[in-house]
Every structure is written in C-alpha cells, then in structure tokens.
C-alpha cells in the first residue's frame, strides 16, 4: 500500500520532501498497474491505442531523465540525453520499432536508475532552488512546476496502462486474498503490509509484517516484486511460506471474488 502521508524526509528540505512523496506514490501505483506483465503483454498495442505499456514505461523514464538535465540547468539537455532514452521520449514510429521484446525487469531497472539520479539531485538542493523563477515554455515557471509536470505526465500514462490492462485476458476476473503485499526492500522480495479483517488471508493466519520467502514453492526472496504474477481467479489457492521470529511456516490462502 503506497504511503499517503506527505511529510518530512531525512536528507531533504521540507517542500522537496513532500514533492518526493507525491512522486513516490505515483510510481508505486504505476508499477501496480503492470504487476507481473510478460514481454508479450508489454508489447501489445490494441486497436485504438498508439503506445504499448513498454513504450509508456520507457517514456516515463525518459521524461524524468530529461527534466533532471533541464532543472539542473544543463546548457544542452537534448544533446546530453542518453541515446537509449530517445525512443521513449519520442514514442511514435521510433518507439514502436525499438521498444519491443523486453521483460518487465528492463523497465523496472530503467525507472529505478533514473529515480536514483533524481533523488541524488534533489538531496543536493533546497526549497529556494525549487521555487526560483526561471523561463519555462515561453513563460515564467519554476522547478517545482517542472517536477510536478514529471509526475503529472506519469499519472496520465498510468491511466493508459490501466486501459491497456483491460485488453489482457490474463489480468481479468482476478480474485483477492485480502492481503496487501509489497516489496520487502529496494524493490526485491515480498512482505505482507496488511491483512483485511475477515479476509481469506486473515483466516489462513497471514499477518501484517510477515516476510514471505516462497509462493507456491518458488523462492521469491531475491525476486523483483513487480515481476511476480500474484493474481489468480477466485477459488484458486496459493501457499505462502512465511518467515517469523519463531521460524517458517506454510499458509494456504484461497482467493475469493472481489466485492462488487
């Protein structure tokens, strides 16, 4: 569950900390939209759509990277933008031709690498830098608006990802366990953040804070969380191997239909 508290963050000035909170929430919900997608699903461009999910993820990374350069005052951001980001920035025919056949991990790593650069940049700046007036789009803007625009653009494309999901049969009609799972650390592993009262997960004994080391016999300790295909139809069971201070135990949870 993404954090909904916009507050101070260690290593960042107050306004920048809250900006990062909004960017982080946006990114987490973006990755939820493509949880467990295969390369074929990431490449699909249904009728009426201009971009694949992979193209949109590459675009998010490219937009964030070029705004790093712009907000840091680079004299030639276009010239400095790395060649591998141009297909994602341009999309169109170039994007359709070049952004194909890649696993979800490729996009996860690209997004994480760019985000690490953004956090390093923002950690070295302060709120006065964020608010400083400067020319933008033929008018006067500031870096606060630039970084707002970065995650505003991502939110728009997240909506497109959710529309693309409707064209993926394997992601329709999924049941729920009532457990909210999340990465354990740095995008890797699986942790149960919370369990809804009365849900199948609670009835099976799963608890918030449990570290999940295997799902259906597959070790997930070093897995990229968002690569894992966690969904399944109602009545389908999964066995979670849980690690607690007292040791490890297996808990079997059977999904139910989602409310409504």
What are these regions (language model features)?
Residues 90-131, 144-150:
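Acidic/histidine-rich alpha-helical segments that form the ligand environment
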Residues 170-194, 231, 239-241, 250-260:
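PDZ/PDZ-like peptide-tail recognition elements
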Residues 2-9, 16, 20-34, 39-91, ...:
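Short, contiguous alpha-helical
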Residues 174-214, 218-221:
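PDZ/PDZ-like domain segments forming the peptide/carboxylate-binding groove
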């Amino acid at each position: 569950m993404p954090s909904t508290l916009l507050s101070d963050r260690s290593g960042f000035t107050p306004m920048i900390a809250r900006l990062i909170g909004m960017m982080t929430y946006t990114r987490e919900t973006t990755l939820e939209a493509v949880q467990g997608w295969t390369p074929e699903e990431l490449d699909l461009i249904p009728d009426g759509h201009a971009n694949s999910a992979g193209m949109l993820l590459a675009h998010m990374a490219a937009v964030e990277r070029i705004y790093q350069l712009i907000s840091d005052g680079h004299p030639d951001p276009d010239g400095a933008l790395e060649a591998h980001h141009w297909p994602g920035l341009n999309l169109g025919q170039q994007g359709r031709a070049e952004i194909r056949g890649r696993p979800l991990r490729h996009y996860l790593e690209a997004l994480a690498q760019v985000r690490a650069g953004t956090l390093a940049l923002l950690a070295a700046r302060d709120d006065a830098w964020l608010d400083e007036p400067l020319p933008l789009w033929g008018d006067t803007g500031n870096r606060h608006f630039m970084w707002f625009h970065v995650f505003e653009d991502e939110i728009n494309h997240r909506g497109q990802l959710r529309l693309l999901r409707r064209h993926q049969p394997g992601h329709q009609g999924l049941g729920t366990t009532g457990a909210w799972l999340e990465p354990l650390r740095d995008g890797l592993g699986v942790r149960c953040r919370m369990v809804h009262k009365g849900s199948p997960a609670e009835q099976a004994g799963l608890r918030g804070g449990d570290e999940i080391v295997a799902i259906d016999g597959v070790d997930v300790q070093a897995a990229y969380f968002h690569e894992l295909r966690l969904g399944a139809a109602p009545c389908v069971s999964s066995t979670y191997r849980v690690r607690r201070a007292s040791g490890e135990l297996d808990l079997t949870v059977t999904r139910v239909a989602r409310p409504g």
